[in-house]
Amino acid sequence: MDEPVRQSYRPDVSFDGGDLDCGSGLLLLIRRHIDPLARGQILEVRSTELSVEQDLPSWCRLTGNELVSSSRNAGTWSFLVCKGSLAEKSESPAPTQPKLGAVRHVEETGISARASKPASILAIAPLSVMGIGSWPRPRWMLQAMHEHVEGRLGDAEFQATADDAVRLSVEAQLRSAVDIVTDGEQRRDNYASFVGGLLENCQLIPLTDLLPLVDDPEEFEKELLSLDVPASEVRHPAVFGKLRRGRPLAAHELEFTQSLTDRPVKIALPGPYLLTRIMWMECISDKVYATREELAGDIVQILREELHELLSAGAALVQFDEPVLTEVVFTGAKNSRSFMCGALSEKGSAEHELAFARELINQVVADVPLHRTAIHVCRGNWTRDESAALSGDYLPLVPTLKALNVGNYLLELCTPRAGEMEALKDLPQDRRVGIGLVNPKTEIVESLEEIIAKAKKAADLFGADRIFLNPDCGFATFADNPVCSSRLAEAKLSALARAAEILRAR
C-alpha cells in the first residue's frame, strides 16, 4: 500500500481495537469514535490485527477520511485517522474525549410486553385521503439530522428543530385537505433504519462501513450508485447487543402531531420482517443472536409494546411498512445482498420468507382492533428512476395479505409496475384497501379525471365503503434522497382530496 506521510500529530481521541479486523467489528468501533469528532480532528486506532494495515486505507478512501500516519511498536499498530482532511483541522484546542452519543449500551435482555387498552377513536371514513408517511425535509432539518446522529447536536436542540419541520409538514397536509395526518417522518433518517438510533445496543453506521462485509464490495457499490443511493449518507442499523426498547420509537411523534391538529393521526413503523432483514447481518448480529429467528423474537416484542402504546395514546391507525415482501417474490432466493427497499441481509426461498413474514406480523398485531392496523407494500422508493424499481402484480402476495391480521392494506397501484388492481379482488371483505392513485416519483400532478376514473374502478371492485385514497409511497422515504419536492407533494395530495370530494358527492 502507499505509505501515508509520517508526521506527528496528537490524537483527539484514541481507542484499542485489539485483534478485531475490519469485517468483524473494528469499523463499528471506529465509527462510534469518529462520528462525534469535528472535521479536522484526529482519531488514533490501535490494533494488533495485521490485515488492518491493508483494509483501513480502503475504508478511509471510501468514507472521505484521511489516513495521516501509521506506525508499529512491539506488534501493535497505531493508525492516525483524520475526520475529513488535515486541511480542515482547526487551530483551536479540541476536547480530549467527545461524548459518544450515537449508541446506548445495556446489559438487560428482557423486553416488557405491556398491554394497554386502545383509546376510543372514530372509525376512519371511506374515501379518506392520507399520505403514506414521509414528507421532504427542509435543508436545515437534514443538517440537524446529520449532526445529531454523529453526536454533535444534543437531543433537545434536535427535537426543537424537528418540531419546526413537523409543523411545516402538517401545515402542508392540512392545506391539501387530507383526512388523516402524519408527522412526515421529519425526525427519521429513513423509514426503517431510524430505529437503530433509538433502540439500545444498536448503532447507525453509513453503508460505506458495511462494504467489507459483503461478498463483492465493488459490485455492491455499483448497485448503490445505480439506485441513486448515497452510501456515505444513508445509515444502516448494526446490532451488537440484545435489543431493548428503553424509550418509545414514535410516541413522541404522535403526541406532537396531535398538538397541531384535531384530525386523526397515523403513525408508520417498519414491519417486523423488514426490521429482521435489515438488522440480521453475519459477522455482526450473529455474535449476539444465534439465529435470525431469535433476533426476530426481540423485534416482535419491541413492536408489540410500541403498537399498544400508540393505540392507547390515540393513534387512529398504525401502519407497518413491509415493502421488502415484493423483493422476496420478484427477485427470488439469492446468495448475494441487495439494497432493494433497504434490506441487506440474504434470504431464503419466497415460500419460506413469506411464511416467516406472516408469522412475525401476526405476532405483532395479535389482540388489537383490526381496523386500527395497516400494512403498506410497494416496490421500492429509493430513486425516481422507474426502471430501477421492482415490477410485478400483487397476485403472488395475495395469499400472504389475506393471512395477515391487519384491517387495512395501503398499496402502490398508480405506477404501471404494480400491475392491475384486479389481482387483489379476493382480499377479505372485512378489510379496507388504500389505493395508490398518485405516483410520488413523477414530476407531473395526475389529472383529476385520471384519479377519479381509477378510484371508481376500485370502488366497483372493492366497494366504495372499503377504499381510501393515497399516494403509492412516501414522498421522501430516505431523508437525503427525496423522490418529490414538498411543493409537488402538496399538489398531489390536493388532487387526491379534490377527487375524494367529488366521489363523495356522487
Regions found by a protein language model. Name each.
Residues 93-506:
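Domain-level signal for soluble alpha/beta catalytic cores
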Residues 2-99, 456:
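Domain-level signature for proteins that mediate thiol-based redox and metal-cofactor handling
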